[in-house]
């Protein structure tokens, strides 16, 4: 029997407002525990929440960028549950009237485009954070309590772990481009839960779903779903039944582990938040927010192809993150050739960042520095090989590329007279290679070019070297 995989994702994104959603407490990551709190965040008796309008703007902007319909009449509700990270014993969220509904984003996997529906985007407050000690005690930090948060719920349109990965990449890029969140998973500003079920191919009814948690990276989402897909298939093929349960992904063992079995759906006893009136969003408000949405990744990608002549793949990679795309834009504004800038960013820059496990802003490289180096290549001042030495200095220590070339004596040798003398010396020392080349062994030319580069410490102009080698060999 063959099965179809059904996946839905719930993504929580913290909004980077200056203050929290219902209080004036600072909304900044990294403060000492329990210092960014107030009596409102902690639910003291008699205090009242005041809605942060900027958080509403940000939620609307995110919803619009995800092609959602924006509600005209929306409200907040109390989601009741008891847990140590929830000091009020309820969370202010949205139940039946979310701020955005019926959205979608388009992903591409294996060269095929697919639209993934978004059921809803609603605004709520985040909970505190528990830290579990090895001594059996747990500590709670309420700095995160009351942070404005949007929950983005996808339709069950995702069919493979690879599609889930592509959806998350695209969603993150769109949110980052709007500027409403930095989406840093390592800081908890983007978190994801996944729901997965299997059904026999051709069956309309969904199978029993499993919820996956502890998915701390997009790669873990993909790996967790891959494991769970195989686990459920094995259970069904052996005649077993899938339980409705919550499982966590164990990265060390690359498997999912049972956390708890759900006997029914959670009953949070939602009811309207009595301390907040309904929120009415008129057309003027909607249009003001819509006018603030910047160019989004798909539009920027299309522009790179149509106006800059970049291949579609290059444009896709460059626009995956706003940080990389903005860096590329600034580099070409500094006068660099667009294709060369793209090649360096996708090649040497990404390779360095991946090897060092760094973000681009954590390196010393600047758009002006990269552009300056590229202009030295196009002017013939340095070769592409020498440029790699300059690049290493730029990305590790920064500086002016022209000064680096000057200080390290890296200027490309393009003087024909000087190179012709070195060519003669190389040919005199490698008579066999001349004979091999004349006998049709093209690799001999590559060997001679290598000897020239060795003799000049990589500073010889490679195009001129090829020309002079061929000329001098013809004379012999």
Swiss-Prot record:
Glycoprotein keyword on record: no
UniProt enzyme class: ligase
Highest taxon, organism lineage: Bacteria
PROSITE patterns listed in its UniProt record: GATB
Reaction it catalyzes: L-glutamyl-tRNA(Gln) + L-glutamine + ATP + H2O = L-glutaminyl-tRNA(Gln) + L-glutamate + ADP + phosphate + H(+); L-aspartyl-tRNA(Asn) + L-glutamine + ATP + H2O = L-asparaginyl-tRNA(Asn) + L-glutamate + ADP + phosphate + 2 H(+)
Enzyme Commission designation: 6.3.5.-
Protein keywords: ATP-binding, Ligase, Nucleotide-binding, Protein biosynthesis
Gene Ontology molecular function, alphabetical: asparaginyl-tRNA synthase (glutamine-hydrolyzing) activity; ATP binding; glutaminyl-tRNA synthase (glutamine-hydrolyzing) activity
GO BP, one annotated term: glutaminyl-tRNAGln biosynthesis via transamidation
Record carries keyword Iron: no
InterPro entries xref list: Asn/Gln-tRNA_amidoTrfase_suB/E (IPR017959), Asn/Gln-tRNA_Trfase_suB/E_cat (IPR006075), Asn/Gln_amidotransferase (IPR018027), Asn/Gln_tRNA_amidoTrase-B-like (IPR003789), GatB (IPR004413), GatB_C_1 (IPR042114), GatB_Yqey_C_2 (IPR023168), Gln-tRNA_amidoTrfase_suB_CS (IPR017958)
One Pfam family linked to the record: GatB_Yqey
Summary of the function given for this chain in its UniProt record: Allows the formation of correctly charged Asn-tRNA(Asn) or Gln-tRNA(Gln) through the transamidation of misacylated Asp-tRNA(Asn) or Glu-tRNA(Gln) in organisms which lack either or both of asparaginyl-tRNA or glutaminyl-tRNA synthetases. The reaction takes place in the presence of glutamine and ATP through an activated phospho-Asp-tRNA(Asn) or phospho-Glu-tRNA(Gln).
Subunit note: Heterotrimer of A, B and C subunits.
Family in the record: Belongs to the GatB/GatE family. GatB subfamily.
Protein name: Aspartyl/glutamyl-tRNA(Asn/Gln) amidotransferase subunit B
The organism of origin for this protein: Shouchella clausii (strain KSM-K16) (Alkalihalobacillus clausii)
